[in-house]
Curated annotation (Swiss-Prot):
Source species: Ehrlichia chaffeensis (strain ATCC CRL-10679 / Arkansas)
Protein's UniProt keywords contain Ribonucleoprotein: yes
Entry keyword set: Ribonucleoprotein, Ribosomal protein
Methyltransferase among keywords: no
Protein's gene: rpmI
Family to which the UniProt record says this protein belongs: Belongs to the bacterial ribosomal protein bL35 family.
Coiled-coil segments: none
Protein's GO biological process: translation
Region (Disordered): 20-40
Protein name (Swiss-Prot/TrEMBL): Large ribosomal subunit protein bL35
Listed Gene3D superfamilies: 4.10.410.60
Amino acid sequence: MPKLKTKSSVKKRFSVTATGKIKSTQSAKRHGMTKRSKRSIRVQRGTAIMNSSDSRIVKLFMPYSR
């Protein structure tokens, strides 16, 4: 059986924790940050854990990181 390929776009955007959760950077922080509060800008710096319904889809594209 041939090896399965990992999607390059998913490989660059997401990482898997030791417990199997999918971790990514926060979205919606490219432009228009002047009208947001300082707290929301500060929160956007960190990473986010995806919920289980979305992480199932991402795990399909990363076959060897389970």
